[in-house]
């Protein structure tokens, strides 16, 4: 399955969940596209709830179905911790996500483009693979020629706070994944247990 590249607000309205994290997509029209007036989603079956939760998580991080399911399988091979928690941590360790968490991009999609176009370095070496798994302590930065990109400047100006498991040096324009996140520090509106149930059904 290919990656969705259309308007994220449409997906947000369909899922009843803000992919941007701002809630703006749902503030004016809190119902699915094609519906008018009140939300007519109705009650979902157990499978429907599991599927919706899986789609919420997959679309939040911008992965294809294959990437998502492969990462889920990897999480299942980690011996310590819960499957769902480990899955969330692996999603957070993706390079495109860390770039987003550092504030170098306004959205994960924008962060993925920065990585794809060769603007990002890890420990001083250019890395253009969005799925690259970042280790705690690795230094994430912009290439020298990329530090004046307007989209980066705008993203940094819009930052109002960062998650506690990353650190960013505004002067050096570089940051690190300080440690692996705790589940409590990630989106509370995602129920990863339903995602585990979906794949284990």
Curated annotation (Swiss-Prot):
GO molecular function, one term: rRNA binding
GO cellular component: small ribosomal subunit
Top-level taxonomic group: Bacteria
Keywords linked to the UniProt accession: Ribonucleoprotein, Ribosomal protein, RNA-binding, rRNA-binding
Domain S4 RNA-binding residue range list: 93-156
InterPro entries: Ribosomal_uS4, Ribosomal_uS4_bac-type, Ribosomal_uS4_CS, Ribosomal_uS4_N, S4_RNA-bd, S4_RNA-bd_sf
Database matches in CDD domains: S4
Matching PROSITE patterns: RIBOSOMAL_S4, S4
Disordered: annotated span: 20-46
Keyword Lyase assigned: no
UniProt signal peptide: none
Entry annotated with the keyword Zinc: no
Function: One of the primary rRNA binding proteins, it binds directly to 16S rRNA where it nucleates assembly of the body of the 30S subunit. With S5 and S12 plays an important role in translational accuracy.
UniProt record similarity statement: Belongs to the universal ribosomal protein uS4 family.
Record HAMAP family: Ribosomal_uS4_B
Protein name per the record: Small ribosomal subunit protein uS4
Lineage start: Bacteria, Bacillati, Bacillota, Bacilli, Lactobacillales
